[in-house]
């Protein structure tokens, strides 16, 4: 009986929650967004448009990096960027 109550409480606490992740957002072709001139404002706006909490230009790779992206938003994988192909 105690386990049943615990299970109900856990289900109620997790119902409706959406996971968040950090990473490099990508376009349809697995290409990350480039931030020329190290433009943090551009990356922050891009990330927030994708429902992330915030973002910045990661200067080592010159790519936008987002914090708190929804799980449904694709991020950079190990696959190659297929620029120009749909």
From Swiss-Prot:
Q: Where in the cell is it found?
A: Secreted
Disulfide bonds listed in the record: 31-81, 35-57, 43-64, 47-66
Q: Where is the LCN-type CS-alpha/beta domain?
A: 21-82
Chain positions found as Serine amide:
83
Q: What is its main location?
A: secreted
Q: Name one GO cellular component term.
A: extracellular region
User: What UniProt keywords apply to this chain's record, in alphabetical order?
Assistant: Amidation, Disulfide bond, G-protein coupled acetylcholine receptor impairing toxin, G-protein coupled receptor impairing toxin, Ion channel impairing toxin, Neurotoxin, Secreted, Signal, Toxin, Voltage-gated sodium channel impairing toxin
Is Disulfide bond one of the keywords? yes
| Expressed in which tissues | Expressed by the venom gland.
Write down the PROSITE patterns for this protein, in alphabetical order. Answer: LCN_CSAB
Give any GO molecular function from the UniProt entry: toxin activity
Q: Which GO terms describe its biological process?
A: defense response
Please give the SMART domains that the UniProt record associates with this protein.
Knot1 (SM00505)
Give the highest taxon in the source lineage: Eukaryota
| The keyword Nucleotidyltransferase appears for this protein | no
- Signal peptide location: 1-19
By its UniProt entry, which InterPro entries does this protein fall under? LCN-type_CS_alpha_beta_dom (IPR044062), Scorpion_toxin-like (IPR003614), Scorpion_toxin-like_sf (IPR036574), Scorpion_toxinL (IPR018218), Scorpion_toxinL/defensin (IPR002061)
In the record's own words, the domains note is: Has the structural arrangement of an alpha-helix connected to antiparallel beta-sheets by disulfide bonds (CS-alpha/beta).
Family per similarity comment:
Belongs to the long (4 C-C) scorpion toxin superfamily. Sodium channel inhibitor family. Alpha subfamily.
- Tell me the protein's name: Alpha-mammal toxin Ts3
In which organism is this protein found? Tityus serrulatus (Brazilian scorpion)
């Amino acid at each position: 009986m105690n386990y049943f109550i615990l299970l109900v409480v856990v289900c109620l606490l997790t119902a409706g929650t959406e996971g968040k992740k950090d990473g490099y957002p990508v376009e349809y072709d697995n290409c990350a967004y480039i931030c020329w001139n190290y433009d943090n404002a551009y990356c922050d706006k891009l990330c927030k448009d994708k429902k992330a909490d915030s973002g910045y230009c990661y200067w080592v790779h010159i790519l936008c990096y987002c914090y708190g992206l929804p799980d449904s938003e694709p991020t950079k994988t190990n696959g190659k960027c297929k620029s120009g192909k749909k």
